[in-house]
């Protein structure tokens, strides 16, 4: 069992989102994640939460985003109750992932717990 934590400034993510728009979202999020973020009153807050979640998961896996794990290898979607759930789209990763995401006006934070299946 491993854990990972990440925190990001919402203003930083908002600036990147406003500067590059969908290009940044397409790089970091899956189509389903983009749909959920854009459905929110302030998509930048949801985007920051997803970004922090993916970073926290990559830290828990010990790989980081890049060489072995891409942004689209991790999908974080809210279920009907609003709870974030993780799907790993990488055949070499057999893990159960639990994630918690929170934010205030300034920051989004995520904590991931990964367990081998």
UniProtKB/Swiss-Prot annotation:
Enzyme class: transferase
Record-level Gene Ontology MF annotations: holo-[acyl-carrier-protein] synthase activity; magnesium ion binding
Keyword Cell wall biogenesis/degradation carried by entry: no
Organism superkingdom: Bacteria
Function: Transfers the 4'-phosphopantetheine moiety from coenzyme A to a Ser of acyl-carrier-protein.
Gene Ontology biological process terms from the UniProt entry: fatty acid biosynthetic process
EC number(s) recorded for this UniProt protein: 2.7.8.7
Positions bound to Mg(2+): 6, 55
Cofactor(s) for this UniProt protein: Mg(2+)
Catalysed conversion reaction: apo-[ACP] + CoA = holo-[ACP] + adenosine 3',5'-bisphosphate + H(+)
The protein's name: Holo-[acyl-carrier-protein] synthase
HAMAP family registered for this protein in UniProt: AcpS
Organism: Chlorobaculum parvum (strain DSM 263 / NCIMB 8327)
Any Gene Ontology CC annotation: cytoplasm
Subcellular location: Cytoplasm
Family, per entry: Belongs to the P-Pant transferase superfamily. AcpS family.
Keywords, alphabetical: Cytoplasm, Fatty acid biosynthesis, Fatty acid metabolism, Lipid biosynthesis, Lipid metabolism, Magnesium, Metal-binding, Transferase
């Amino acid at each position: 069992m491993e854990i990972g934590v990440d925190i990001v400034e919402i203003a930083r993510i908002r600036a990147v989102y406003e500067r590059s728009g969908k290009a940044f979202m397409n790089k970091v999020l899956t189509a389903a994640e983009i749909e959920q973020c854009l459905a929110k009153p302030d998509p930048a807050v949801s985007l920051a939460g997803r970004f922090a979640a993916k970073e926290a998961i990559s830290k828990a896996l010990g790989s980081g985003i890049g060489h072995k794990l891409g942004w689209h290898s991790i999908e974080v979607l809210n279920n009907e109750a609003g709870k974030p759930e993780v799907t790993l789209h990488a055949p070499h990763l057999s893990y159960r992932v639990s994630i918690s995401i929170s934010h205030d006006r300034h920051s989004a934070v995520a904590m991931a717990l990964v367990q081998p299946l």
